[in-house]
Design a protein with these regions (language model features):
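N-terminal domain-onset segments
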Residues: 1-52
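Short, compact, well-ordered microdomains
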Residues: 53-87
Length: 87
């Protein structure tokens, strides 16, 4: 087995709080067909994101990433913080 290092790339991301009035949401997450909410107004609110691999679920505190080719997907906070740093 070989080892690999992730290439340094710059992505856009934000931490999703699940708050209905979150002002940090970038315009790209609100493009029709990218994402939709379930259980709005409840503690169980989730953000469903249409990805190349199918619909993925983001929960409160997850990071939402837009990759280098415009793909959007959720990432758990521990993985995000171990993989990315501010630029």
């Amino acid at each position: 087995m070989s080892e690999y290092r992730k290439k340094p790339v710059v992505i856009e991301a934000f931490k999703w709080t699940g708050d209905e009035h979150q002002t940090e949401d970038p315009a790209w997450i609100n493009v029709p067909g990218i994402a939709f909410f379930e259980n709005v107004g409840t503690p169980e609110v989730v953000l469903k994101i249409n990805t190349l691999e199918g619909v993925m679920t983001a929960r409160r505190g997850d990071y939402i990433i837009r990759g280098i080719k415009g793909e959007v997907y959720p990432c758990k906070p521990d993985i995000f913080e171990a993989t990315y740093e501010p630029v």
